[in-house]
Amino acid sequence: MSLDVTLTGQKKIEWNGKTWSVWRKDDESGEWEEYQEVLYEGNITHNLGDMAEEAGIYNALWRPYKLSPHFVETDDYDYEYEQEGNITVLASDISPLIREGLNKINADPEHYKKFDSPNGWGLYKHFVSFVEEYLEALEKYPNAVVTCDR
């Protein structure tokens, strides 16, 4: 099992010295809507969840909707799932927290290596590489919408 993260944003094109937004007409409704494109995709094993938790970035990576002021803590799985689908998280909402966590991880590698998966599927070096790459994308596309699939 793994975590898949995706950043999406409005498609833009350069033409005649200007930047244009791309729109498309929905086949079913006939309504015009902004065309969204995938800006970044990443994947990491769930075996690194404990390492992320220790660094204080589990929710930022796996469940960013929980960081929203609109999120209501609940024991009702269906209601939480509904909230996840209804709360929009932007890259800029989570990038500072992820940077802070990455700094913690890089400051004490030996501590975080204690969370390496015994089977080798999920090691410190994999986690650092994933977080660095993801953070770079988050900072490059601060207005991108973040989605996570667990």
Regions found by a protein language model. Give the residues of each.
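Acidic (Asp/Glu-rich) sequence patches and key acidic residues
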Residues: M1-R150
